[in-house]
Structure formats: structure tokens, C-alpha cells
Amino acid sequence: SEWIAQSARWIEERHSPDLSLVYLPHLDYNLQRLGPDDPRIAEDCRAIDRVAGELLKYYARRGVRTVVLSEYGITCVRRSIALNRIFRAKGWIAVKDELGRELLDCGASKVFAVADHQIAHIYVNAPALLNEVRATVEGMEGVTRVLDADAQRAEGLRHERSGDLVAFSAEDAWFTYYYWDDDRKAPDFARCVDIHRKYGYDPVELFVDPAIALPKLKIAAKLLKKALGFRMLMDMIPLDPSLVKGSHGTCPADSAEWPVLIGTGSSDDPIDAVYVHERLLAACAG
């Protein structure tokens, strides 16, 4: 976050753009790793408050209008939901065996889910199953809402790539993308930081597998192997979703855990997230 803030100042001094979008991600990591109730989060808050405060003061000295926007508030979680494993048990998921590893075959699957924290997009390739899939997901422990296309439109969520169904978890739950039943058959990328090959967001990437003895030494050995030209997998990630302590996506009951928008008006009234865009455009025009 400090490097990003310094880069933002560098760009402002050299180019003075009409619009700068600056993302300071520091809080995101430990809030998911430790959970918002962990006392260690206070130090993270102080650290990012200093970085953000210095950047805001810098822009103020240059006469730049600033808007502070948080994407989401993170809530404590204690359980995970593996939709694709349930779908597999129903016979709806197709997997390919590659050298003893299982890959999800989305095209051949009747149903599959793409996980995104506390939201899951469910794609139903067999339309005749839609009602059964919805009933199955609605009956899962930890799922609070399932929206079809019409319900998505009513809430401003319907996108051309949205799932046929969109599921929301309870505040204390989140969705994993896991689809294998045996960790020995998990794909090689499951234990790596590999966001583009996974079937959804994987917050377990924030952890090093606690079962690995001397992890720094193992990482060094892998980097040496790579430097020597050998194929190497940085497979240091655990497959234990219980490690995750914070998530987001479901609207919390406590408004203190909602995201904030500061600097676009004097009203304290909440607004739907779909209207943030026009507020930002108005701030740019004003």
C-alpha cells in the first residue's frame, strides 16, 4: 500500500491526470486471514490510516478533490460451503483425470459453480435441472438466498455473464470452489497462487500450508530449482478452508460492517452499490 501511494504521488506530480484510481489493499489480507475481531487488526488499521491520511493531505495541498470508497466490509466467518462437491454428489459435475489429478470440465458439466467469497454464480448447462438445482442450493446449510435471472435484474445484479442462479451465503459462511473429494487428486494449481486457473476466488491462497516444515527453506529450494531451468510448482498453499476467518459479499445485518463512500455529498443515507458509479462521475464533473 505504501508503494502504491508513492506511485500515485509520482503520477500526480508528473502527469496530473483528470482522474486517479488508487487502491490501498493493506486491510484486505489480514481481515481475511485473521478475521475482523482479531486484536492484531488494530495495528493494520493504524498503518493504513497513516498511509491513506498522508495521501489525502498530499492531494489536498494540490487542490485535488478526493473520494474515499471501500469496496466492501469484511465479516467474521466460521464455515465454508463447497457447492461443486454437492453438485458432484448429484452427478452433475464432470471431471477429467489428468495424470491422477482431477480437472473440472465446465463444458461437459450439467451444473457448476464459480465461487466469489460469499456469492456463487451457478451455471446450469442442462436447463431442465434449473428448478432442482435451485431447490438443492436453497436447502444447503449456510445458504440464505438464491436468485434466478428475474430476481437478479430486480436487484441490479444481472450481467450477461452472471450465473443462471446466484447464491448468497449466511454472514458467517463463504463459498469455496473445491470440487474434488480426495485431496490427493486436487489439481496441481490448487496448492498454488494461481488465480486464473481456479474456478473462483480462493482466499486460502493467503496462507502457507502449516503442515510444511521450514517453509522458507522450501520456497528457497523451489526458486533455486526455477533458476536452474527446472519445472517448478510453488505448491505451498493448504487445502483447509477453515483457516479463513473473514469474507464479504452478503449484506451484513449490522450497517457498521457495510462499505463506505466519503466525499460525494453530505447525506448519511445508504445508497445501492449500483449508484456509486454515477456518484463518482458527478464528482469528476463537479
Please describe what each predicted stretch is.
Residues 18-19, 119, 257-260:
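Short glycine-rich loop/turn motifs
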Residues 179, 266-275:
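Soluble, non-transmembrane catalytic domains of enzymes that act on hydrophobic metabolites at membranes
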Residues 54-243:
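Secreted, luminal/periplasmic, and some membrane-associated catalytic domains
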Residues 170-171, 264-266:
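Short acidic-glycine loop/turn motifs at beta-strand connectors
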Residues 23, 149, 264:
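Conserved residues at the C-terminal ends of beta-strands
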Residues 243-261:
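Short glycine/proline-rich, acidic loop/turn segments that cap or connect secondary-structure elements
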Residues 164, 261-264:
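Short, hydrophobic beta-strand segments
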Residues 1-68, 274-283:
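A long, amphipathic alpha-helix that forms part
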